[in-house]
Swiss-Prot record:
GO terms for biological process: regulation of DNA-templated transcription. Regulator of pre-B-cell leukemia transcription factors (BPXs) function. Inhibits the binding of PBX1-HOX complex to DNA and blocks the transcriptional activity of E2A-PBX1. Tethers estrogen receptor-alpha (ESR1) to microtubules and allows them to influence estrogen receptors-alpha signaling. Keywords: Coiled coil, Cytoplasm, Cytoskeleton, Microtubule, Nucleus, Phosphoprotein. Residues 39-53 have a biased composition (Low complexity). Residues 1-10, 61-70 have a biased composition (Polar residues). This is Pre-B-cell leukemia transcription factor-interacting protein 1. A motif (Nuclear localization signal) lies at residues 488-506, 696-719. The C-terminal domain (AA 443-731) contains a nuclear export signal. Association to the cytoskeleton through a N-terminal leucine rich-domain (AA 190-218). Residues 1-135, 491-568, 701-727 are annotated as: Disordered. The modification Phosphothreonine is found at residue 153. Residues 498-544, 551-568, 716-727 have a biased composition (Basic and acidic residues). One of its GO terms (cellular component) is cytoplasm.
Amino acid sequence: MASCPDSDNSWVLAGSESLPVETLGPESGNDPESERAPRAPQSPSRAAAEESAGTLDGGETVSQNESSKSGPILSEEAEAKQGVLEGDDPGVESPGPGDTEAQGDLEETPEVVGLEPDSQDLEDQSPHRSLPSSPKTAWIREEAHHSSSDDDTDVDVEGLRRRRGREPGTPQPAATLGVEDQVQGEGAGGQLGISLNMCLLGSLVLLGLGVLLFGGLSESESGPLEEVDLQVLPDVESDTEMLEAVGDGQDGLQQLQTSEVLDSVPSLQNMALLLDKLAKENQDIRLLQAQLQAQKEELQSLMRQPKGLEEENARLRGALQQGEASQRALESELQQLRAQLQGLEADCVQGADGLCLQWGRGPQAGQVTKEQGPTGQEPSPGFLEQKKQLEAEAQALRQELERQRRLLGSVQQDLERSLKEAGRGDPARAGLAELGHRLAQKLRGLENWGQHPGVPANVSEAWHQKPHFQNSREPSGKEKWWDRQGDWKTEHWKHKKEASGREKSWRGEEDRELVGRRKEGKPRVEEWAGKKDGKQQRSKEPPRKSGRPHPSGERQKHPRWKEGAKDRHDPLPLWAELSRHKYQAPQGCSGVHECARQEGLAFFGIELAPVRQQELASLLRTYLARLPWAGPLTEELPLSPAYFGEDGIFRHDRLRFRDFVDALEDQLEEVAVRQTGDDDAVDDFEDFIFSHFFGDKALKKRSGKKDKHLQNRVVGPREEHSPHRQG
């Protein structure tokens, strides 16, 4: 059986067993007034909770009200009905403990079943459900009147059980119940809507923060910062819904605070991004400044290169001009010697041993015959010696030409190397190319001239007019001319064998010079130019009136010259040459102490204290005491007031001490050559003096004065002796 739809009591199926019908009265503990009292306004959440509780207890409340209204009627009907049941079925017993437990289970079950009609009443809000229970009471009365029939009673009561109801209270109007249900429904719906809106708002806020964190960094690098504010702010529609749903001032204030926090976050991040960007730009500016400085230094170095090339071009041009002048002089000398030799060979009839036995015909034949005597005697030994001398001169000139050719070839190689090293478009390149072209032409001219020598006729005639036989003690005009050109050439003319040996040694020296040039990586034409300058200065130097002796090589090989020189001239003072030396005054300083300090720092990297006369005199005596031939030099030292002041201090402000020591060494070398024929004994003079004033370590820092001095010194007989000793 199913429950009756018009009954306020909940009827449930009891199962297949025949359960007794029990009518329960109102509960004594319930207060009808407390149930009918108006409820205070509550929050939406509490109203929803009470609504659910009311839904569960709805059936009980209605049944209690109905039972309270029809209390006397039900009591009468129950007694009548009980009597009928007892009369009809005397075997039915009162419920026992098992029935009580089953009754408890059934009491819990109708509560679940009774939720459905109560919830349907709330949703439909039908007013007839909340009306008074008078129809129900009538239905119960009709049921009680018809209960006299056994069949009807069995049909109506079998398997049914009535729930316990509450005490009936004051009935409420239907309109009041409908309004309360509607308010409760709206409260629950409003609370649900507010919670959904808050969830949507929270999700939008989280979404905005995510976009700000992950999208704001990438957009800050591209530049626009306004888009970050647009992405972070919530949608306008969502704000409107939030305000309409909440309807509370506190929620609006909270929303404003949230928006302010969201607005402040991107501003801080934008400031951090701007600071990072400024730091990067500052670093880039520093890098650009460093690059500009490097480019500036490179441009300055490139601008200084043409100046160096111009200086090198000028040096090479001067060396070329000197080589050309020396070549022209040698060519003229060689032509004269060839003409003289051919004239002698033409006028002389040679014998089996190669000697001139008879003079030929010619204008000079009579003169020769007169000089030799009317008997036609053989030529004197002086003539033969002069002939050999001329042959030696010719051979020496050939060797000198070959030497000049090799020197010009080395200069040409240096020029070609310079042209290769110089860059294209350099203004000095044209001058270097012109010098190389001129050198190549000179080399070809020398080769052609050596193969096809020209012999002018007037030269031989002029030579035949000169006397051929002169005293050995009186030098001939040719010898005087050679003395004006330079005493160093006579060594070649006198001794052919020694000339060839010296040529070999010179070749070895030249090879060493070439190796040095390759190691240094730059041309050393100035060395060759220094040699040529020395030769020209010696050749242009007039004969000295003081009668300075010839070099040691000529004195050793030809004692007659030495004897003649001693007979004709008085010996020079040992230190006389030192006073003729021209010194250059130091520049950029004033005062003895300042100039001495500047000189020491410039040449040795160490400050030089003013040199005292007594200290230098002691050093000179110590050095000269080691030389056996230097005894007379110690008697009168070259320490005149021209070099030292009244206080005995060297005049550093008038001449450099370094130049003074160089002059002393040159004078000692000349004296050594005159005494021993060798100048190697005094090569360590400078090192001895400078090591005392500066120390041994300072000698390594010298600016190359020794090499320059050797270049200027390698002229004359010493130029030939030094390589010969090394070889």
